């Protein structure tokens, strides 16, 4: 079963996830894994919060607080696949510097001498990899481009990308390579078979992450996905410039995955605002991007300082 937990900011989505995990751990300390999947920067705070809430119950062994990168590492550690040392961002930039010194560039030759160029190229290559764009794909695209300037830029990027691949082949893998390996290993990962998974804190996924979620849908017994959006039926969300378009896009794509896999879905909507104790703050949060403007009597909850 796939459950979408939706609500505005401060409506208690993360708390609902933690309370559900806590209840299951108290009722049954052992059993199938309970996984809460978060953006990497949230994992420490949420794991600490969960540990504090369970300190009177002796901690936990079946609950896992993971980011996407840590999930990939766990899958590869348990199911095999880690063959080469991991290359971090600094290491990748050093390799790129070596590639740039030995690669003949055309239109990007001057830019390549600028400070932070390697960091920019590293980010571009990361986006290529997360989107499933290989060197071969770029080479095929080059044959279809008529604009000379664009073609030269893409040709330079392709040469750099190919050079980095050559330097890393059989020696290192980066986070994107690790994620790709994990996606391939997930179907045979018995560790997550029939696990219960909560996915919280994301407002968007890159293409690799969508593929991870699709694999998890096929493996897990239940998945609960939180989205910071208050109404899935509002057609305004379909506009690319809409405030909650990214969250709505996540809902649509993952809902379609569930339909394809014949997985039942449900939607839980949280409406109470737990974050804003002052009525004026809650009103601004609710009405900030709404038109026409709505007026409200001032109750003393805000001060404007100039």
Sequence positions of predicted segments:
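Accessory N-terminal region flanking or inserted into the helicase ATPase core
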Residues: 2-5, 102-201, 212, 237-239, ...
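Catalytic acidic motif of RecA-like/P-loop NTPases
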Residues: 42, 203-204
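Structural recognition of the conserved hydrophobic beta-strand(s) that form the central parallel beta-sheet
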Residues: 36-38, 65-66, 198, 222-227
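Conserved RecA-like helicase ATPase core segment
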Residues: 210-305
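Conserved P-loop NTPase-based nucleic-acid remodeling module centered on helicase motor cores
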Residues: 31-140, 148
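Glycine-rich P-loop/Walker A and Walker A-like loops and their local beta1-loop-alpha1 context
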Residues: 1-51
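Structural preference for long, well-ordered alpha-helical segments in enzyme cores
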Residues: 5, 16-21, 49-50, 99, ...
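Short glycine-/polar-rich loops that comprise or flank the Walker A/P-loop
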Residues: 30-33, 58-63, 193-194, 220-223, ...
């Amino acid at each position: 079963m796939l459950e979408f937990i939706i609500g505005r900011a401060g409506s208690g989505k993360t708390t609902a996830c933690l309370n559900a995990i806590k209840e299951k751990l108290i009722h049954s300390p052992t059993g199938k894994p309970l996984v809460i999947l978060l953006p990497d920067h949230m994992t420490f705070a949420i794991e600490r919060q969960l540990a504090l809430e369970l300190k009177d119950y002796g901690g936990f062994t079946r609950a896992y607080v993971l980011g996407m990168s840590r999930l990939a590492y766990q899958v590869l550690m348990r199911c095999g696949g880690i063959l080469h040392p991991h290359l971090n961002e600094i290491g990748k930039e050093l390799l790129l510097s070596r590639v740039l010194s030995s690669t003949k560039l055309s239109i990007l030759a001057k830019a390549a001498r600028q400070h932070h160029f390697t960091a920019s190229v590293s980010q571009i290559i990361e986006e290529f990899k997360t989107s499933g764009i290989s060197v071969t794909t770029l080479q095929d695209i080059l044959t279809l481009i008529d604009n000379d300037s664009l073609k030269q830029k893409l040709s330079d990027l392709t040469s750099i990308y190919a050079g980095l691949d050559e330097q890393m082949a059989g020696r290192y893998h980066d986070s994107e390579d690790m994620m790709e390996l994990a996606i391939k290993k997930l179907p045979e990962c018995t560790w997550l078979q029939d696990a219960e998974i909560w996915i919280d804190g994301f407002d968007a996924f890159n293409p690799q992450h969508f593929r991870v979620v699709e694999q998890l849908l096929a493996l897990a017994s239940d998945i609960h996905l939180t989205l910071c959006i208050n109404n899935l039926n509002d057609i305004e969300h379909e506009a690319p410039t809409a405030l909650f378009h990214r969250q709505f896009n996540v809902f649509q794509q993952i809902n379609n995955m569930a339909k394809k896999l014949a997985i039942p879905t449900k939607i839980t909507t949280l409406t109470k605002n737990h974050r804003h104790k002052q009525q004026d703050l809650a009103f601004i949060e609710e009405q900030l991007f709404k038109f026409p403007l709505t007026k409200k009597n001032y109750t003393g909850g805000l001060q404007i300082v100039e």
